[in-house]
């Protein structure tokens, strides 16, 4: 078979213009010419990243008109849940756009097939997200069995075998009710296996990362799971661990020559992108990680600065509540606001406790003009398009 990465055939692209691992748990983290040639499957569509049928809307205008400001803002939040009751409560009461299944989540929500119960509490399609890379970053190994780390995969498997492994894992995730996987990790790294990225990276060779990560993302897509590549603009050569504090990458020009190549090659293949909590000399302001940096999001969106096509898909933050690169400087409400202002479409954090307070804060930010209404509307439509909730 042959895997082909078709850049134009994505659900998200139809609404153009309009995501360290995302677990926050210390130590666990959470041009297509280089596409693999050993398998043959065409991307003819991108799976809708939600757990229920789409709602009718025309390029987002009908959807936007049907939502209050608070409902719009809630669609831009994705939070970790402890189990079914917690998930149903936050979805029903606050109408958030997504839930995150972490290592602390009661697995009975998955094994008892209770995700549809959660999704039915939502008026709009619900993103059900997970951080399932394989190796040490796996949330369902006890249910579906272990998969190898990215590095072990590239060292022991062919590209075709990687595609088949991802296809099987994706089908397993879909059967459990998952719709979005914050994987594959496309960081380019030669770090030791047990470092923050380490064996989560396929290789220190960018083209090897493109081939294997591309095959993994393709397998997820073909299984009906929406893949999210990470951690933009590249964590593989950074100093430090964003779970524990500030992280600085090599200068932007160095990233363009290596770390950004997988993003350039894969961002147009029907994926989302997760922003890393990374300070980048020559790109971000001091003290402002890429996840909340307008300049970093603009680099991704425009593409021009690193030779990529414009990116019109959904942009996610890494965890904003459990990683000290953010929490040492920002309260969760301020961090979410900063991310949305910067151009991110959906903010991720690990508990439901602060959702009402964050929504209150964001409503005030819109009222004061600090968070433009147009930015909110753009993000709502981008997220809705990724869920298949708008047709454009």
For the regions a language model picked out, list residue spans one by one:
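Sec-dependent bacterial lipoprotein signal peptides
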Residues: 1-20
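N-terminal low-complexity, Pro/Thr-rich disordered segments
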Residues: 22-65, 392
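Mid-to-C-terminal alpha-helical segments outside catalytic/metal-binding sites
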Residues: 364, 368-392
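Short, acidic/polar
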Residues: 81-93, 162-172, 256-262, 330-338
